[in-house]
Design a protein with these regions (language model features):
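Short glycine-rich, flexible loops that bind phosphorylated cofactors or substrates
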Residues: 92-94
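A short glycine-rich, Lys/Arg-flanked "PGG" loop and its adjoining helix->strand segment in the class I
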Residues: 96-110
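Active-site capping/gating segments
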Residues: 120-163
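Conserved beta-strand signature within the Rossmann-like core of class I S-adenosyl-L-methionine
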Residues: 107-120
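Conserved hydrophobic residues forming the short capping helix/wall of the S-adenosyl-L-methionine
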Residues: 58-59, 103, 125, 129
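Conserved beta-strand segments of alpha/beta enzyme cores
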Residues: 41, 66-68, 112, 133-136
Length: 163
C-alpha cells in the first residue's frame, strides 16, 4: 500500500507530532499512518461529511484513538499541524495556498506538505511556483512496477512561491 511509503520520509521519533490529511476521503493515507505512528495525532480534513463518516468508522472499528475528523474546507480550517499529507486531492499550487496557515508555528523537522501523486508532474510543479522535492516511491522499497510513476512530493513549510 503506497500510503505507507510516506513513512520513509516522515520522522520516526517518540515526539507527538500532528499530521493533517487534506482531502482525506476514506482515510488514506492517514489511517494506515495512524496505525504505524500511534504517538502522532491525525487530523482528517474533508469537505464531504460522508467520506469523513467512513474514515471515522474505520478508525473506531480498529480502535484508533489518535484520529479525529473535521468537516470543513481546508482553506477556512483553523487547526494547526506539523505535517500535511494528501493523496492527489488537488493541484500542488492550490494545496500549497490552502494549507500554509495550518503549518504556522510548527518547529518539527522537515515540516511541510507530503503529497502522493502519479504521472508526469513537471507541468503541475512548474505552474505551482513552489520548490518541490520528488521521491520516486519505487526507490524506497521493493515496490511492484505499478509504482514506477508514483511520487511523494515534498514542499517545505518555508518555501516562497515564485509566481
Amino acid at each position: 500500500m503506497h500510503s505507507l511509503a510516506l513513512a520513509w520520509l516522515l520522522p520516526h521519533e517518540p515526539t507527538s507530532y500532528t499530521i493533517a490529511d487534506v482531502g482525506c476521503g476514506g482515510g488514506f493515507p492517514s489511517i494506515p499512518l495512524a496505525i504505524l505512528y500511534p504517538q502522532y495525532q491525525f487530523l482528517l480534513i474533508d469537505s464531504i461529511a460522508k467520506k469523513l463518516h467512513v474514515a471515522q468508522s474505520i478508525a473506531d472499528e480498529i480502535g484508533l484513538t489518535n484520529v479525529s475528523t473535521h468537516h470543513t474546507r481546508v482553506e477556512s480550517c483553523d487547526l494547526r499541524c506539523d505535517y500535511i499529507v494528501s493523496r492527489a486531492a488537488m493541484p500542488l499550487g492550490r494545496l500549497y495556498d490552502y494549507t500554509q496557515h495550518l503549518l504556522q508555528g510548527s518547529r518539527a523537522p522537515r515540516s511541510g506538505i507530503y503529497c502522493l501523486k502519479g504521472g508526469d508532474l513537471s507541468e503541475e510543479i512548474a505552474q505551482s511556483g513552489v520548490t518541490a522535492q520528488l521521491t520516486a516511491i519505487s526507490t524506497l522499497a521493493n515496490y511492484p512496477d505499478y509504482y514506477q510513476d508514483k511520487w511523494i512530493v515534498y514542499v517545505a513549510k518555508q518555501d516562497k512561491r515564485t509566481n
